[in-house]
From Swiss-Prot:
It holds the Pfam family PPR_2. Gene3D superfamilies: Tetratricopeptide repeat domain. Its main location: mitochondrion. This is Pentatricopeptide repeat-containing protein At2g13420, mitochondrial. It comes from the Eukaryota. The keyword Transit peptide applies. Keywords: Mitochondrion, Repeat, Transit peptide. One of its GO terms (cellular component) is mitochondrion. It comes from Arabidopsis thaliana. Belongs to the PPR family. P subfamily. PPR repeats lie at residues 172-202, 206-240, 241-285, 286-320, 321-355, 356-390, 391-425, 426-460.
């Protein structure tokens, strides 16, 4: 097995669709801050969560710790409080009450987004009224959250009312495209089409808007309507581009029935028709076009078709990307053709493209299916010694492999490596480990990792609660369960109302 000579960013096949979604964006994106490492923000957020009292202000807590609140620190703190909306709002109102308020338009937008996620729209509207300076972004955040909550009519009304708060600055085509794009992404394509038909005279239209609507119909698996809008687009004098055709192609391939064989072949013919139409209009398929079709072949385990398509791609002078190679490697591994997959891995590196952890995960999943502990460990040790380090998903696959094989010492080794890695364990990691320990009746260890999971801020799945609960009772470990339940009650404030979604049904042995 060839070692990596260069670091590649992790890639997952679902990112292909996400990338297409990004490409067809109408041009307006919400520029909200992203979560960044910040020890001060961690300290403040944990202090507010632990010591929050709805009947007392939080000024003393912050002043006693001598904390100076900069705009960036406020943003990072609010991001860490996004799952505790009441505390986030109290913190924000405290900032506004200061003699020199340290709130900014960005912090207003953040709290509006946080409150919108939990449908506190009355509070959001009041905050917008109280804002000194609103921006188009403020209203588009509100529009997005209303649509996400299923309040589509209110979202359109908020879009229409925005100019009253923006000194009569009317929205343009780019913001109109954002409205349509958001409606389509949340599955309200029919309403998006209605809004488009009503207002296209006012806002106009372009290839991006039509591409958004075509993508919306594809999301609903209505390829017939997507093709109809493509025809309407051309008849309106707007030329489709390669992105438009890739969206349609992705819709056809994503909804493709892989079985029986007749249906799969029909979908292949439909995809080839899109390629033919592209060429007739003078548009050459690009690497994304080929990658979409390759991914469909890979899902159907059609190794020969996948390899032939890659050869055709190279013959046309199109260099495969890491996404393309990963699709082919996945197909070869799932078909049991590991030697060919390894040869392709060498070809990747020779072409200057280093496999990512996702590429290696294809091998690990095949080893898991084969119950090949030696093959998995050999590859894992090569990755550890190379430049491409295992991702959290890699560790999760390995944990599942060795838990199933009952090799708990190896599980411990992998878990220690995961905790020492840059990413660390996630919810899936803890879930796999706790369930695996329960299956081996290692109750003490299972309880320990269960508590650790909660302390790290991961809300366990209901099934995990029930598995541990029933297992402890069946094993006459009621005292252990009571101690564990007490710990859970102490930690429940971390999750707020979410914690209440996991009630325990009385269980009898």
């Amino acid at each position: 097995m060839l070692l990596l000579k260069q670091i590649s960013p992790p890639f997952h096949l679902h990112q292909l669709r996400r990338r297409i979604s990004t490409i067809i964006s109408a041009g307006f994106t919400l520029n909200l801050p992203k979560l960044e490492p910040s020890s001060d923000a961690e300290l403040i957020s944990q202090m507010l969560i632990t010591n929050h009292n709805p009947f007392h202000f939080m000024e003393s807590s912050l002043q006693l710790n001598g904390i100076s609140l900069t705009p960036n620190l406020i943003h990072q703190t609010l991001l860490r409080l996004r799952h505790n909306s009441k505390i986030a709002l109290s913190f924000f109102q405290y900032l506004r009450s200061l003699p020199s308020p340290s709130t900014t338009p960005t912090s207003f937008n953040l709290i509006i987004d946080i409150l919108g996620r939990v449908r506190q729209f009355d509070v959001v509207r009041q905050l917008i009224v109280e804002m000194d300076q609103t921006s188009p972004e403020t209203f588009l955040i509100l529009v997005k959250r209303l649509i996400a909550a299923g309040l589509t009519r209110q979202a359109v009304r908020a879009f229409d009312d925005a100019p009253c708060f923006l000194e009569n600055r009317r929205f343009r085509l780019v913001e109109f495209g954002f409205l349509l794009d958001t409606l389509c992404k949340y599955g309200y394509t029919k309403m998006a089409v209605g809004v488009f038909n009503e207002r296209k005279e006012e806002f106009g239209s372009d290839e991006k808007v039509y591409t958004i609507l075509i993508a919306g119909w594809c999301k609903l698996r209505r390829i017939d309507m997507a093709e109809k809008f493509l025809v309407e687009m051309i008849e309106s004098g707007i030329e489709p581009n390669v992105v438009t055709y890739n969206v349609l192609l992705n819709g056809i391939c994503r909804t493709a029935s892989l079985h029986p064989e007749e249906r799969f072949e029909r979908n292949v013919r439909n995809a080839e028709k899109v390629f033919d139409e592209m060429r007739q209009r003078g548009i050459e398929p690009d690497v994304t076009s080929f990658s979409i079709v390759l991914h469909m072949y890979s899902r159907a385990h059609k190794a020969e078709l996948t390899l032939d398509k890659m050869k055709l791609m190279k013959a046309k002078g199109i260099s495969p990307t890491i996404e393309t190679y990963t699709s082919v490697v996945k197909c070869l591994c799932s078909c049991g053709r590991l030697e060919e997959a390894e040869e392709l891995l060498e070809t990747m590196v020779e072409s200057g493209i280093s496999p990512s952890s996702a590429t290696y995960n294809c091998f690990f999943k095949e080893y898991k299916g084969r119950k090949d502990a030696n093959g998995a460990m050999n590859l894992y040790r090569k990755m550890k010694n190379g430049l491409c380090k295992p991702s959290t998903q890699t560790y999760n696959v390995l944990l599942g492999t060795f838990i199933n094989l009952g090799k708990m010492e190896t599980v411990k080794e992998i878990w220690d490596d995961l905790k020492a890695s840059e990413t660390g364990p996630d919810l899936d990691s803890y879930t796999s480990l706790v369930h695996g320990l329960c299956s081996k009746e290692k109750w003490k260890e299972a309880c320990g990792y269960f508590v650790e999971m909660i302390e790290r801020g991961f809300l366990p799945q209901k099934l995990t609660f029930e598995t541990l609960y029933k297992g402890l009772i069946q094993s006459n470990k009621m005292r252990t369960w009571r101690r564990l339940k007490k710990k859970l009650d102490e930690e429940s404030i971390t999750f707020g109302s979410e914690f209440q979604r996991y009630p325990f049904e009385p269980y009898k042995r």
